[in-house]
Amino acid sequence: MVRILCDLIRWYQQGISAQRPFRVCRFTPSCSQYMLEALQRFGLKGILLGSWRLLRCQPFSRGGYDPVPNHFTFRRQG
């Protein structure tokens, strides 16, 4: 299941996102890359982290550098 989700994200990155003339995501790494890394690191639990990131990626967010945490948690680090 994780592999299928990762393949879908890569398809999005290479097919849809690459066609956009400008960057849309407010964060680094991008939301799709964050979801991909979260899935690879935490398996299906990574969906929760990636979904939380997608909810935070909106016009009123400051954005910035927000890497996948080393340990699975929903608490803010820093």
Swiss-Prot record:
It is found in: Cell membrane. The keyword Zinc does not apply. One of its GO terms (cellular component) is plasma membrane. The keyword Electron transport does not apply. Pfam families: YidD. It is a peripheral membrane protein. Keywords: Cell membrane, Membrane. Its main location: membrane. It comes from the Bacteria. InterPro entries: Membr_insert_effic_factor_YidD (IPR002696). Belongs to the UPF0161 family. Could be involved in insertion of integral membrane proteins into the membrane. PANTHER family: MEMBRANE PROTEIN INSERTION EFFICIENCY FACTOR-RELATED (PTHR33383:SF1). HAMAP family: UPF0161_YidD. NCBIfam families: membrane protein insertion efficiency factor YidD. This is Putative membrane protein insertion efficiency factor. It comes from Limosilactobacillus reuteri (strain DSM 20016) (Lactobacillus reuteri).
